[in-house]
Amino acid sequence: YVAQSAAASFNPAHRLIEQTTSSTIRFGIKEKAEAHKDAHVLYAALNLPDPTNIGDRYPHQVSGGQLQRVMTAMAMSPRPDLIIFDEPTTALDVTTQVEVLSSMRAIVEEFNTAAIYITHDLAVVAQMADVIKVLRYGEEVEEAATRQMLKSPKQDYTKSLWSVRALQKEEHTATDSIMSLRGIDAAYGTAKVLFDV
C-alpha cells in the first residue's frame, strides 16, 4: 500500500533504509543484509539519486517526490502480487508527478506486480491504468478498458467526469496580450536599469 501522503507515513526518527526493509526483515522474508541490498535495487529502479546511500537519510532530508518513491520501494520490498496506490501524486507538483508516475509504472512492470490506482486525477488514470473502474458513493458505475472508457464512456456519470476534462480553453495567439504596462522604471541600487518602458 502506498499512501497519499508519504511525509505522514514515515517515522522521522528512523533512516529510510530501516523503514524500507522493516517488514521484510520482521516477517523473515529476507535477512538484514539481503534486505538492504534489495532496497538499493528498488531505489535504483525507482530512479532515486544515489541509490546505495539515499537510505541513510531521514525522511525530512529528501524531497516529496523522493519520499513517495521510497514509500513505493517499501511497499515493493516483500514483492507483493498486488500493490495499491492511494492518490499517490496528490501532494506533488506536476513535474514531480510525471517522474513519480513513470517510476511507479516501471517498477510495477519490472516486478510483474498488479496495481490498483485510487485517484480523482484523470491524467493519472489515462497514463497508468489498463482498465478503469468508475465508482460513485462506493458503488461501481462503469468498467472498461482505458482507451474505450476515455473515448466513449457509457454511463451519464462517467460522461460528466470526462466532459470536465474536455472543456476547451480559450485559444490565444502569440500576439495576444495578457497584460499591458507603460511608464515602468526600475533601478538596481542607484543605477537605473529601465526607464519609461
Enumerate the predicted regions with their spans:
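A short, surface-exposed alpha-helical micro-motif characterized by mixed small hydrophobic
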Residues: 125-127
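A short, proline-enriched helix->beta-strand linker immediately N-terminal to the Walker B motif
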Residues: 77-81
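Q-loop/switch helix immediately C-terminal to the Walker
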Residues: 5, 12-26
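Helical segment within the ABC ATPase nucleotide-binding domain
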Residues: 98-111
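C-terminal boundary and immediately downstream tail of ABC-type ATPase nucleotide-binding domains
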Residues: 49, 151-178
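Short, glycine/charged-rich "phosphate-handling" switch motifs in NTP-dependent
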Residues: 131, 143
